[in-house]
């Protein structure tokens, strides 16, 4: 299978899953609310984040972070394109990884452009210790980064 086709399929599926789940959360849940799914472990929440992963730069007193993250994401998309172009057809881990990162990056970019913030809704916790809420795009970016690390060590 052609590397561009494979990465494209992965990124489109990722993007669709990300946007469909975020739309459902925005339409079905009131902002800043929570619904318990697995008591003591997992909630669905409706929160927004103007910053990056784990709430980095998610502050109301600064307004430039949206434009900053839009520019950084566009630069990253260019880098992903260059990495995909240079990837060998047989390096499926790298190609899959780039597809996941591409879809996730575009998913969060759409939120930043349309809503000036990213919708997060997956809340895992133990007791009172909550992991920062995240979304499908974040999962895809992490999976993609992991696949690219595997590719790097596999080809070393």
From Swiss-Prot:
Active site residues per record: 120, 138
Uppermost EC category: hydrolase
GO molecular function, one term: aspartic-type endopeptidase activity
Pfam families: Peptidase_A8 (PF01252)
Keyword Cell membrane on entry: yes
Keyword Membrane found: yes
InterPro entries linked to this entry: Peptidase_A8
Pathway membership: Protein modification; lipoprotein biosynthesis (signal peptide cleavage)
Bilayer topology term: Multi-pass membrane protein
Record-listed E.C. numbers: 3.4.23.36
GO cellular component: plasma membrane
TM region(s), chain numbering: 37-57, 68-88, 95-115, 133-153
Subcellular location as annotated: Cell inner membrane
Keywords annotated in UniProt: Aspartyl protease, Cell inner membrane, Cell membrane, Hydrolase, Membrane, Protease, Transmembrane, Transmembrane helix
NCBIfam families the record matches: lspA
General function of this protein: This protein specifically catalyzes the removal of signal peptides from prolipoproteins.
Recorded family membership: Belongs to the peptidase A8 family.
Annotated protein name in UniProt: Lipoprotein signal peptidase
Organism: Maridesulfovibrio salexigens (strain ATCC 14822 / DSM 2638 / NCIMB 8403 / VKM B-1763)
